[in-house]
Design a protein with these regions (language model features):
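Small/polar beta-strand repeat architecture
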Residues: 2-7, 15-30, 36-39, 53-126
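Acidic, glycine-rich flexible loop segments
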Residues: 144-175, 185-187
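Oligomerization/assembly interface segments of phage tail-like spikes and tubes
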Residues: 129-148, 196-211
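Short structured motifs
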Residues: 124-129, 187-188
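Short coil-to-beta transition motif at edge beta-strands of beta-rich domains
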Residues: 37-53, 160-167
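Well-ordered beta-strand positions in beta-sheet-rich domains
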Residues: 46, 58-62, 70, 177-183, ...
């Protein structure tokens, strides 16, 4: 068991993705192995993965290179063939690069990601039951110290206004790293309170899972 603390954490985004490399096969293994001709990756590269598997697609993963035409996806256990349909995981990979620091982060919070349930009550029973039907969408909200002259903040505003998708990276001081991918939204209107720094919220509405590495 280990504990992590927020002090020293860094936050980054990227809208820079290399050309897509076609994944012609994705194995039902732990970790899953991707067949991708002349991928050009090195171990530890961060990739945006698009796949027919719902729990894999639109997420950022790290790779371990096996050879010039294949790599494994760190942390992806696809051995459950009932959940990861054989042959359906094909798609593409794009290397993520050009990480940009998110400036003056004061707080971070997450929303959603919790299970959704539907309540069912058969007529022959007095006791209703909750049946799981999936998960609520996930999002992350950061509170930033407002500085309209900050170049990174201006870049974030541009991404927000054009409804562009970005990668998100949170690195803790102990080495753990979490990734996300989705739409970035940044406010231009600061909040003002006596005795406190002016702030603006920035949020990321994630399209896929948040993937974490120790």
């Amino acid at each position: 068991m280990a504990y992590a603390f927020p002090e020293g954490a860094t936050f980054n985004f990227s809208s820079t993705f290399a050309s897509a490399k076609t994944i012609t096969a994705l194995s039902n293994a732990n970790p899953a192995v991707a067949t991708c001709t002349a991928h050009g990756y090195t171990t530890g590269d961060e990739i945006l993965l698009t796949s027919g598997w719902e729990d894999v697609t639109d997420s950022i993963w790290r790779v371990t290179v096996i050879d010039a035409n294949s790599f494994s996806i760190q942390g992806l256990d696809a051995s459950n063939t009932s959940f990861f349909a054989p042959g359906a995981g094909t798609g593409s990979a794009q290397k993520v690069s050009g990480w940009t620091a998110i400036p003056q982060v004061l707080t971070i919070s997450s929303q959603g990601g919790d299970p959704r349930f539907t309540t069912i009550q058969p007529l022959a029973k007095r006791n209703a039951i909750n049946v799981p039907v999936g998960f609520n969408p996930s999002s992350i909200t950061l509170t930033l110290g407002h500085d309209a002259s900050n170049a990174q903040y201006q870049t974030m505003l541009g991404i927000s206004r054009t409804l562009s998708k970005v990668g998100f990276k949170m690195a803790l001081s102990g080495g753990a790293t979490s990734y996300g991918y989705g739409y970035m939204a940044v406010s231009e209107v600061p909040s003002l309170n006596n005795g406190q720094a002016n702030t603006v919220p920035a949020s990321l509405a994630m399209l896929g899972r948040s993937i974490s590495y120790a």
